[in-house]
Amino acid sequence: MRRGVRVAHTCGAGKEPVPPFRNQQTGTRCKMSTQSTQSKPVQNVSSGGAFYAGRGVTKTPTISHAKGIFFWDTDGKRYLDGSSGAVAANIGHGNERVREAMIEQAKRFSYVVRTAFTSEATETLCRMISELAGSGFDQTFLVSGGSEAIEATLKLARQYAVVTGQPKRSKIFARIPGYHGSTLGAAAVTGDPDRDQIFGPIMRIMPKIPAPLSYRIPEGYDVHSYADHCANELERQILVEGEDTVLAFIMEPVGGIATGALVAPNSYYSKVRKICDRYGVLLIFDEVMCGAGRTGTFLAAHHWPHALPDLVACAKGLSAGYTPLGAMIAPNRIVDKVVESGGFLHGHTYSGNPLSSAIGVAVLSELVNQDLMENAQRRGVILRQRLNALKDRSTTIGDVRGMGLLNAVEIVEDKATKAIFPASRQASYRASEIARDLGLHIYSRRAASGKFGEWFMAAPPLIITEPEIDLFMELLTETFRIFESENR
């Protein structure tokens, strides 16, 4: 292996940084996401304006300021952030301690290149993440967001296989439906046929197995037997592909927008872990959305201690929307082998950025000091009770599911048959539009052109209080009163 620049991207909890990863620096570009090929309203784009993918919203308000779980537009209208943006703003908006940490670091310096220097903020953040992640999660590799974190796990897994004498292992299994990011490597393990049609020719689409859906279950199964079937499919496909060719299996332990806060039966996690162990397959948890306290524990993986993953990708809540930030969390047993081989062949210009790191330290300090993980667990129970009560009164809410303050509300045309609305109705996006007009932000998705259903995320910031849950439910109830009156 040729020699290259060596970069200390990782640090362990409570100890000196391990020998640095080798790095090949790359530039980064802004990402944009295409949700599907189906017809839906798209924003008007004028010359010189910002360009984003249309998601069913024809005109987006311009936000002026934000505080707590609310933000205000330039016309003075207030919105309750019912989905924490894109399930990112975990500690709410306008936190003064985060702002002060941001200012203090910016006064000192905002950037150094990780091929040559480190910073106190970066080392502190790495230690905090590893300590919160717990035993077996020794090292942290900082990046700028979720897609980059996923890419890092895939590349570390592959390099580990090569340096340990397993070069044939290159196939990464994932679930359908599923979502792991917008970059090409992350898209290759995303279970979305619409995206595959567009981007498949420029990437290597990885094998998929069914996700253990809990609402739309095939005939002849119940929740538990279908979850068993899905786990068995993992083993069957490993044998079909050739066990010595399978590198990893990636999944969200608690689903994000692609599956609507899917939580499988406990037995599924232990069975998947045993299958991966049996065939030498690395288990990767995508905790970009469900990590950083969102489900009531720092990692969603902590709910299943008997089935911990080998690698974790985390983002969103790590910085709570205050800066682009993500992380790969890895054990020494994997990192050490790669480091000993000459270093990790990966990196980004902004990996370990000092300003983002200082913000991350402040955000995680708030998460711990304000006991927000416990609040997520406690308020999540209350919110699901209230959502289920609304479901019982509603003609178009088919299911409520989730864990902590990561929840989804599934929208159907017919509750008896679970039939979805026609694509032309754009039901979940219309519900979001009504909610926004009432002063409530909810994050919606029609998964794979509706093949797997449509829903919105009920995932407010972890700081939410009971009176604020009351207001959330008042606005959501009115949203569905209007929505259902339009669809009688």
Set out the residue ranges of the language-model regions:
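Basic polycationic patches enriched in arginine
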Residues: 2-6, 22, 29
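Short, low-complexity intrinsically disordered segments enriched in A/P/G/S/L with frequent Arg
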Residues: 8, 17-19
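Low-complexity, intrinsically disordered or signal/transmembrane-proximal segments
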Residues: 9, 24-25, 35
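Short, linear, compositionally biased motifs with a strong N-terminal bias
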Residues: 23-24, 361
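Conserved N-terminal phosphate-binding loop of PLP-dependent enzymes in the Aspartate aminotransferase
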Residues: 33-488
